């Protein structure tokens, strides 16, 4: 929101300079983004009148003028502006004047004609805008007056960021209210008097969508002069607020928008068939907008229509066929209150963002429309002439938002602020904010003003009291707290411990958005329906993630595009799965996920550059599971996943319950996502591994351990994990360790089979094992493997 400092000071003028005013606005919660002067630094420019203007004898594009600047004689000035003409009031840079850029005006000869000054354009005075030619001043501009004084150019444009809860400050009225409250000053609003109707012409108005449009005002104004020039004072105020002048009617509605914060619209009465109807769009209804584009309206879009078709998208954008044109004689002024929920997200859906939608989405004052209508009518009649008709006000009292009644307790105020503000100051602040205040036994009861949608609960009032009282007026007090030692269960595995482990193994933590691109997500989870946002930040962030892989794979592509070959990332966060059995139909699961790509290790002269494979990711995952003490209860089962390579993926089971997936990204998906080389991912349900087995103390055997190695031949489809589990089961009393140390395929082993070299570690806690006992245990393992897996000892 941009506004002119001088315009603000017309309403409330605290005795502080510009810098202090800006600081005060910032401390009030309206962050100031920038302050710029409305014009460049210049001197010696005055109002003049062109007395004569003739064509230069030696130049087609130059004119020779005689200009009256209030001196003893007329000045001879050569000008090249196409709009220069006799009788025009202009800005004249006198001899000795210094213009922006340290440009000094001296006597010159242009094609043989003397020039004793310069007729200036806005740009030559450092004034932004799209004006062509020299400045055209009103006929009543006093000759000889300094142009800085006449145009009030000693002014600043202040640009503020208005947070969504302070929609009342999207107009000068709201900003002035805040400044007045902070400085304990009265607010001097321009007088807005009721315009007396001169004609009886009205327009039938029917509101079908009452909940979406609780209030709609319309007024016919006939016989206006649409070609009337917008006054310079209005053009200047619009320019300093960042709006360009279009025509008198549009300028007036924009002026009221900036002044009061109330969007308005004007229709050409001759193009309206019958009357006005406020309704929702019909099936396949289309509308040609002011910019010439055609849109197909969705059924939940509120429209302003006549008895035939839609005229405009309510609160968003007007229709091109019904706007003011050079032939317009009669207009219909529209002023309405639309429910923010009826407007929110609609403009973005059509790729639009307008000043009107920006305000209606956040909420405008539902009591402001009659004043705005009278203000716009008075300006229209004063500038364009015409005869106004009566105002037609269609209001549904039951659908109008009602101001909140809020109880403020003294003890809550003191506790949250940490400082005792006197009772009379609290009452005064709330009253100056526009609240209707009454005292209660516990504190105060306040009825919020109609323009403050954000005042709803007790904490809102406390925030307002602290803001107006002044954060800098609240003394610094050391924080006092009653510390309670947190309960810590030994069985709880801290997520921070797992993160530290992954960092130690070369990973970096990533934080990605919960909003993801639905096109990417459907590639990873084609069989799951995501939660689609009705009002997304952007189209590629319009779905809630079903897993953390979507964001992590995007991070891998981002890094690979920046020449980062070795990528190891992990993330913990929520996934959002539609589930009718869950609260609000969405199940939120805390997940732990990781991704690796590129070489196994950083480049080193003593190591080969080998790419990562399935077992690198599996090893990292097993290191995590080792922390839980449940690694022996974990099973990796070959199982397909649409995003993973069918031969290099596995589901992770804990006590026969699926808790995650691990695998290589499918080659086809790898190409679609623009991944560079083999990429591996894993993901776990954190709550399933957040509990660890509490370590139990066991005696360490004083007796020697014995190792025996066996090599068994089994079919290729036999899982090594099943072999190891069977050995542990058979030798449970004496077998303390089973380890695979070699896998062989080749000569001596039939095709379709593999040789597994396994070490068996045997030990007893009470005695030294005899050779016969060791041999018997090994034989039992071999027999069990032969019976279950048709394994045979390799020669």
Curated annotation (Swiss-Prot):
The enzyme's E.C. designation: 6.1.1.20
Family matches, as InterPro entries: aa-tRNA-synth_II/BPL/LPL (IPR045864), B3/B4_tRNA-bd (IPR005146), DNA-bd_dom_put_sf (IPR009061), Fdx_antiC-bd (IPR005121), Fdx_antiC-bd_sf (IPR036690), NA-bd_OB-fold (IPR012340), Phe-tRNA-ligase_IIc_bsu (IPR045060), Phe-tRNA-ligase_IIc_bsu_bact (IPR004532)
Cofactor: Mg(2+)
Catalysed reaction, written as an equation: tRNA(Phe) + L-phenylalanine + ATP = L-phenylalanyl-tRNA(Phe) + AMP + diphosphate + H(+)
Keywords recorded for this protein, A-Z: Aminoacyl-tRNA synthetase, ATP-binding, Cytoplasm, Ligase, Magnesium, Metal-binding, Nucleotide-binding, Protein biosynthesis, RNA-binding, tRNA-binding
Residues of the tRNA-binding domain: 39-148
Cofactor detail note: Binds 2 magnesium ions per tetramer.
Taxonomy, superkingdom: Bacteria
GO cellular component, as recorded: phenylalanine-tRNA ligase complex
Protein name (Swiss-Prot/TrEMBL): Phenylalanine--tRNA ligase beta subunit
Native organism: Sodalis glossinidius (strain morsitans)
Gene: pheT
């Amino acid at each position: 929101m941009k506004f002119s400092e001088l315009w603000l000071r017309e309403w409330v003028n605290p005795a502080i300079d510009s810098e202090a005013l800006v600081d005060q606005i910032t401390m009030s919660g309206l962050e100031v983004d920038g302050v710029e002067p409305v014009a460049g630094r210049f001197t010696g420019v005055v109002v003049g009148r062109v007395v004569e203007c003739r064509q230069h004898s030696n130049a087609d594009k130059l004119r020779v003028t005689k200009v009256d600047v209030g001196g003893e004689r007329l000045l001879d000035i050569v000008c090249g502006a196409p709009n220069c003409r006799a009788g025009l009031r202009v800005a004249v840079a006198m001899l000795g004047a210094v213009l922006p850029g340290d440009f000094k005006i001296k006597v010159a000869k242009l094609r043989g004609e003397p020039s004793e000054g310069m007729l200036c354009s806005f740009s030559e005075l450092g004034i932004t805008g799209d004006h062509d030619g020299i400045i055209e001043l009103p006929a009543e501009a006093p000759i000889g007056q300094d142009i800085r004084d006449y145009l009030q150019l000693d002014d600043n444009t202040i640009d503020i960021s208005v947070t969504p809860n302070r929609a009342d400050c999207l107009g000068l009225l709201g900003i002035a209210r805040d400044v007045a409250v902070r400085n304990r000053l009265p607010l001097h609003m321009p007088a807005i008097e009721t315009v007396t109707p001169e004609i009886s012409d009205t327009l039938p108005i029917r509101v079908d969508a009452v909940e979406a449009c609780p209030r709609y005002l319309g007024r016919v104004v006939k016989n206006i002069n649409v070609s009337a020039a917008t006054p310079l004072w209005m053009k200047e105020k619009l320019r300093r607020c960042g709006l360009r002048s279009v025509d008198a009617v549009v300028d007036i509605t924009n002026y009221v928008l900036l002044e009061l914060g109330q969007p308005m619209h004007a229709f050409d009465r001759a193009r309206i068939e019958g009357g006005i109807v406020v309704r929702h769009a019909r099936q396949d209804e289309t509308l040609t907008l002011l910019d010439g584009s055609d849109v197909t309206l969705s059924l939940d879009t509120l429209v302003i229509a006549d008895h035939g078709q839609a005229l405009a998208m309510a609160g968003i954008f007007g229709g091109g066929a019904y706007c003011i044109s050079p032939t317009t004689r009669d207009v219909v002024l529209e002023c309405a209150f639309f429910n923010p929920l009826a407007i929110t997200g609609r403009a973005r859906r059509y790729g639009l963002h307008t000043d009107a939608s920006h305000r209606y989405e956040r909420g405008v004052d539902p009591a402001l429309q009659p004043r705005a209508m009278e203000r716009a009518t008075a300006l229209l009649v004063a500038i364009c002439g015409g005869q106004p008709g009566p105002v037609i006000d269609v209001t549904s009292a039951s659908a109008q938002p009602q101001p909140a009644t809020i109880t403020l307790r003294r003890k809550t105020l003191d506790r949250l602020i940490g400082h005792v503000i006197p009772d009379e100051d609290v009452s005064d602040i709330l009253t100056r904010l526009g609240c209707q205040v009454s005292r209660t036994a516990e504190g105060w009861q306040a009825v919020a003003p109609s323009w403050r949608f954000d005042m709803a609960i007790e904490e809102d009032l406390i925030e307002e009291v602290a803001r107006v009282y002044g954060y800098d007026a609240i003394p610094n007090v050391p924080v006092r707290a009653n510390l309670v030692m947190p309960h810590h269960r030994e069985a709880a595995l801290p997520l921070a411990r797992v993160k530290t482990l992954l960092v130690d193994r070369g990973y970096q933590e990533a934080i990605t958005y919960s909003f993801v691109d639905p096109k990417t997500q459907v590639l990873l989870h084609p069989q799951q329906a995501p939660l689609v946002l009705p009002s997304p930040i952007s189209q590629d962030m319009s779905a809630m993630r079903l897993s953390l892989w979507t964001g992590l794979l995007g991070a891998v592509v981002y890094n690979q595009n920046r020449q980062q070959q070795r990528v190891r990332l992990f993330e913990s966060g929520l996934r959002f799965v539609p589930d009718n059995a869950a609260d609000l139909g969405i199940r939120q699961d805390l997940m732990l996920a990781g991704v690796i790509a590129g070489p196994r290790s950083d480049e080193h002269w003593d190591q080969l550059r080998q790419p990562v494979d399935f077992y690198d990711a599996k090893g990292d995952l097993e290191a995590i599971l080792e922390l839980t003490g449940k690694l022996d209860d974990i099973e990796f089962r070959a199982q397909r996943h649409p995003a993973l390579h069918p031969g290099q993926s596995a589901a992770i089971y804990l006590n026969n319950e699926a808790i995650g997936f691990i695998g290589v990204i499918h080659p086809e998906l790898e190409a679609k996502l623009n991944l560079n080389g083999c990429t591996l991912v894993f993901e776990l349900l954190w709550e399933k591994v957040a509990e660890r087995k509490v370590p139990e103390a066991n005696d360490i055997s004083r007796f020697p351990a014995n190792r025996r190695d066996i090599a068994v031949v089994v079919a290729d489809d036999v899982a090594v994990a099943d072999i190891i589990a069977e050995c542990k089961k058979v030798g449970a009393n004496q077998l303390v360790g089973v380890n695979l140390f070699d896998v062989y395929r080749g000569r001596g082993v039939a095709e379709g089979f593999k040789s597994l070299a396994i070490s068996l570690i045997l030990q007893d806690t009470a005695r030294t094992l005899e050779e016969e006992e060791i041999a018997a245990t090994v034989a039992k393992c071999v027999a069990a493997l032969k019976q279950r897996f048709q394994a045979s000892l390799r020669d």
